[in-house]
Swiss-Prot record:
Location within or outside the cell: Secreted
Record flagged with keyword Secreted: yes
Cellular component annotations (GO), alphabetically ordered: extracellular region
Keywords, alphabetical: Disulfide bond, Secreted, Signal
Family according to the record: Belongs to the guanylin family.
Propeptide stretch(es), residue numbers: 24-100
Function: Endogenous activator of intestinal guanylate cyclase. It stimulates this enzyme through the same receptor binding region as the heat-stable enterotoxins.
Pfam family, one: Guanylin
GO molecular function: guanylate cyclase activator activity; guanylate cyclase regulator activity
InterPro entries reported in the protein's UniProt record: Guanylin, Guanylin_sf
Protein name: Guanylin
Length: 115
C-alpha cells in the first residue's frame, strides 16, 4: 500500500512539472517558453516592414519594444516586460532564445528552468 501511494505521489509530482513546462527567467521576470517562442513569429511579421524602409533604418535604430508591445498578438504573459525601462534589452535576450528554443528545452541556457 505504501509503495503504491509513493508511486502515485511521484507520478503526480512529475505531471505537475510537465504541466508547468519550461520557464524562461530574466531578472525578476519569468515567462513560459511557449510565450517566448511567439516572439519569433511576431518579429517575422515585422521584418518585411523594416526591410522596405532600409534606407531610413540606417539613420537611427528604432526601438522595437514599443512596437512589439503594442501588437495585439503580443503574448499576455510577456506584457509585464513592456513596462520595464530596459524592455529593449530583455526582448533581445528573449528573442535569442526564441530563435532556437530547442536549446532552452534542454536547459542549455541558464535562464531556462523546468526541463
Amino acid at each position: 500500500m505504501n509503495a503504491w501511494l509513493l508511486s502515485v505521489l511521484c507520478l503526480l509530482g512529475a505531471l505537475a512539472v510537465l504541466v508547468e513546462g519550461v520557464t524562461v527567467q530574466d531578472g525578476d521576470l519569468s515567462f513560459p517558453l511557449e510565450s517566448v517562442k511567439q516572439l519569433k513569429h511576431l518579429r517575422e511579421v515585422q521584418e518585411p516592414t523594416l526591410m522596405s524602409h532600409k534606407k531610413f533604418a540606417l539613420r537611427l535604430p528604432k526601438p522595437v519594444a514599443p512596437e512589439l508591445c503594442s501588437q495585439s498578438a503580443f503574448p499576455e504573459a510577456l506584457r509585464p516586460l513592456c513596462e520595464k525601462p530596459n524592455a529593449e534589452e530583455i526582448l533581445q535576450r528573449l528573442e535569442a532564445i526564441a530563435q532556437d528554443p530547442n536549446t532552452c528545452e534542454i536547459c542549455a541556457y541558464a535562464a531556462c528552468t523546468g526541463c
